[in-house]
């Protein structure tokens, strides 16, 4: 009898454990994503191609993507014996590359009519120091009527890439960009700007004025601040920017035209702590401004890690109220697009 009793108790415990696991899995949230920051090509203007992107989207519940090029091309210099693998691979410079938008346009135009509504092309192939760039963007809007749904990612302050790019250092508040912001407002286009909030070593918001001035001067232009001004390179020298949270809190209150892209360098060390748990202060900020944050993968031309990048936000999303989590995961990006853009609620790619 004691043996039978022990067996019954063991079976009961095993059954209870299975029920708890099942219940936990059943209650786990499933998200449909919009990737608000995806580069179809890399820094050599090469890509794994649309079939692989479509597969990655379908397999990972990524319904919509912002799709853009890379506004610079990395040079393989005459003096370099080996082709670099990344822009930081050697000291050769990068140069502004307008054909990146042609590559994106060609890829999107080859999609089927059923696939097209899930791709949202952004223009990026222009020199942000050139006051002719606004005219170039206008020409691209006319050459591809109805195609472009935003501008960016515009590279301004961008770590070592700033030093490697030929010409002057771009600023988000220069005259050339001012013309572009006016054009964006006239055409109802959001603008994604990469503008570092500080340098690698300064522990203060050294360059904040460069992004805050356009926000103040162009209230009718919708700005997506890429990575909230942070970068992986900054974090190599400064593990965490202590001033970032209070700065964002103030700016989101002051500028209703500011939206935050949480890709690349925001998940850690900001949204999640060292144990991978959501930070309460960041949850509170997103809850206070539930329509102002969006997710992105920031992949460049290769899509094998697309799902991993997007799903890595799940611990943070799970700690938010479900309605807010779905806004951040999918809806907020769609809401910032031009009113004329088709914002399909279907999930044809994920069936």
What are the residue ranges of the model-derived segments?
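Hydrophobic faces of well-ordered beta-strands that scaffold small-molecule active sites
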Residues: 34-38, 65-67, 119-123, 150-152, ...
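Bacterial N-terminal signal peptides
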Residues: 12-23
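Catalytic pocket-lining loop regions of alpha/beta-barrel enzymes
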Residues: 112, 158, 165-294
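Mid-to-C-terminal alpha-helical segments outside catalytic/metal-binding sites
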Residues: 13, 30-36, 45, 49-68, ...
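An N-terminally biased module of ancient metal coordination in phosphate/nucleic-acid-related enzymes
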Residues: 28-106
């Amino acid at each position: 009898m004691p043996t039978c009793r022990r067996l019954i108790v063991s079976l009961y415990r095993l059954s209870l454990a299975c029920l708890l696991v099942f219940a936990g899995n059943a209650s786990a949230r499933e998200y449909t994503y919009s990737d608000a920051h995806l580069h179809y090509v890399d820094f050599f203007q090469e890509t794994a191609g649309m079939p692989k992107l479509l597969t990655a989207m379908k397999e990972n519940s990524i319904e919509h993507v912002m799709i853009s090029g890379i506004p610079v091309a990395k040079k393989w210099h005459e003096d370099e014996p080996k082709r670099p693998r990344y822009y930081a691979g050697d000291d050769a410079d990068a140069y502004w590359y307008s054909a990146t938008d042609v590559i994106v346009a060609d890829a999107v135009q080859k999609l089927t009519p059923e696939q097209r509504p899930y791709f949202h092309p952004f223009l990026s192939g222009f020199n942000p120091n050139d006051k002719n760039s606004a005219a170039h963007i206008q020409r691209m809007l006319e050459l591809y009527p109805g195609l472009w749904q935003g501008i960016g990612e515009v590279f301004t302050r961008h770590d070592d890439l700033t030093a490697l790019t030929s010409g002057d250092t771009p600023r988000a508040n220069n005259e050339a960009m001012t013309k572009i912001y006016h054009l964006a407002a006239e055409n109802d286009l959001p603008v994604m700007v990469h503008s570092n909030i500080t340098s690698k070593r300064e522990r203060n918001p050294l360059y904040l004025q460069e992004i805050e001035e356009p926000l103040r001067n162009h209230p009718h232009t919708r700005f997506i601040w890429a990575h909230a001004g942070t970068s992986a390179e900054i974090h190599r020298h400064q593990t965490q920017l202590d001033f970032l949270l209070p700065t964002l809190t103030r700016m989101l209150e002051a500028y209703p035209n500011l939206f935050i892209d949480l890709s690349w360098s925001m998940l850690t060390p900001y949204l999640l702590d060292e144990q991978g748990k959501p930070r309460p202060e960041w949850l509170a900020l997103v809850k206070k401004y539930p329509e102002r944050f969006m997710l992105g993968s920031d992949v460049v031309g290769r899509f094998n890690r697309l799902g991993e990048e997007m799903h890595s936000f799940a611990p943070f999303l799970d700690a938010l109220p479900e309605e807010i989590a779905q806004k951040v995961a999918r809806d907020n990006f769609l809401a910032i697009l031009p009113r004329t853009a088709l914002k399909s609620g279907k999930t044809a790619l994920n069936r």
